[in-house]
Amino acid sequence: MSSILILLFSLFLFSSPSSSSRHHHHHNSGDTSPVNPSSSLAAQIRLACNATRYPDQCVSSLSEQGRVPPDPKPIQIIHSAISFSFQNLKTAQSKIKSIVDSSVGNLNRTNAANTCLQLLTYSEHRTQSTDQALTRGKIKDARAWMSAALVYQYDSWSALKYVNDTSQVGETMSFLDGLIHVTSNALSMMVSYDNFGDNVASWTYPATERDGFWEKTGPGLGLDPSTGLNLGFPSGLKEDVTVCKDGKCGYKTVQDAVNAAPEDNGMRKFVIKISEGVYEENVIVPFEKKNVVFIGDGMGKTVITGSLNAGMPGITTYNTATVGVVGDGFMARDLTFQNTAGPDAHQAVAFRSDSDFSLIENCEFLGNQDTLYAHGLRQFYKNCRIQGNVDFIFGNSAAVFQDCEILIAPRQINPEKGEKNAVTAQGRIDPSQSTGFVFLNCLINGTEEYMKLFKANPKVHKNFLGRPWKDYSRTVFIGCNLEALITPDGWLPWSGDFALKTLYYGESKNTGPGSDRSQRVSWSSQIPDEHVHVYSVANFIQADEWASMSA
């Protein structure tokens, strides 16, 4: 296979937006043969489907005989939409398994299909959890998990994009495109149900802050220290195992300690104490390993380091992570995650997280392009230091960064020539996803080395708060200190006018020479004071329920 194809596959996660947000063509996912339901049932289905991005497909799928019970409650309609998504997900998995079977000898296509299978397994877990959460009345959890299911389906579609060299792959991509629409519809109905309750007639087409729509929320607990909400790393944790470089304790590698953690550990935390030292390894915390905790001896003292990058044959951005976490409830404190791939070495992730209810405190993330991959679900970073240059905080999670130091580092072999750097590249693909990046009381600055370059010739060094990786990119900075290296424009387009009408980039009560909004791009926003509380740690990621220091 050509090296060009391998490289393209390695970059699939930075592909252009999928058909989930740009295409509106016909597809064959979940085609049904509707039987005319009663007029009252049909009216209920139509009203519910009016709250979706793909209402005709929604009506067709839910009108199938027996899909929705007679005289349904709104929550039953949503359950039916989730069930239909799950049914199509299982079909998609079968189609991709067939691609694996027919791709013997084709490394690129085999790798892409296997990546799809793994991603759709995650999507399956999250879809099942969504249905269970709705039954328990946990609507915020349901929305978070269905948002993640959609992320994995989109990434599966993207994984096939660069190996679309057979009709079988093309047909499977079309089916995945339809699956994305089906899942989007279920998620959209959840958002309306959360905001407007059982009155289906009041449910609305998906809208965002950019449209002037602000969700119903509670008080802004955790928006600033004065609220008294005591969130952070729990005290008094005792280690279950210890890792040390000399091998004189329980384990010599971090991965061996992770492997020793029990699977599906309930609510009990499994604490791994990682002694001072440099651990050269790539670590995976798999889906089955929940509530794993890393505790080091301090930033720069306990260091987990790797050097994988997306320029290597067969390596995707997702798989470059020095530490990659999928198991829920992951926590870390007092250590450094590092990827040493140089600034000319493509995407190279130091830390990637798909962990829901994840809390990282007093940790350091060092890299260049794509340092921190907050891929999906709810994450809370507190008192951390994050360093990089190109899109170095990216992904499609719901992540809050509080009291963090965000540092731009020199980017290229000849950095004195100048460059454009974006701190964030948030990747929300659907307006109903409960995802986005929130920065509270953070410092945005450069490393000492970078600031020397910047001050020597500020006109050639352009630094931005973010750029839109996907259509509905959402990032806000609240109460942050923006230093002089932030350009007056503030925000950078991705390409042309892509996403500029649908993104939401907001600022509120920032300080410092880079906070002046008088020259900001017209497609960024000042967050209305009465809506700033939407982005508190309690409202945005429900951290008051899972990140208590007394937990």
Swiss-Prot record:
This is Probable pectinesterase/pectinesterase inhibitor 51. Pfam families: Pectinesterase, PMEI. NCBIfam families: PME_inhib (TIGR01614). It comes from the Eukaryota. Coiled coil: none annotated. It is found in: Secreted, Cell wall. It is an enzyme of class 3 (hydrolase). The active site is at D370, D391. GO terms for biological process: cell wall modification; pectin catabolic process. Pathway: Glycan metabolism; pectin degradation; 2-dehydro-3-deoxy-D-gluconate from pectin: step 1/5. SUPFAM superfamilies: Pectin lyase-like, Plant invertase/pectin methylesterase inhibitor. GO terms for cellular component: extracellular region. The keyword Signal applies. Its EC number is 3.1.1.11. The keyword Iron does not apply. Residues 1-20 form the signal peptide. Its main location: secreted. Disulfide bonds join C384-C404. Glycans are attached at N50, N108, N164, N445. The gene is PME51. CDD domains: PMEI-like_3. Expressed in siliques. Keywords: Aspartyl esterase, Cell wall, Cell wall biogenesis/degradation, Disulfide bond, Glycoprotein, Hydrolase, Secreted, Signal.
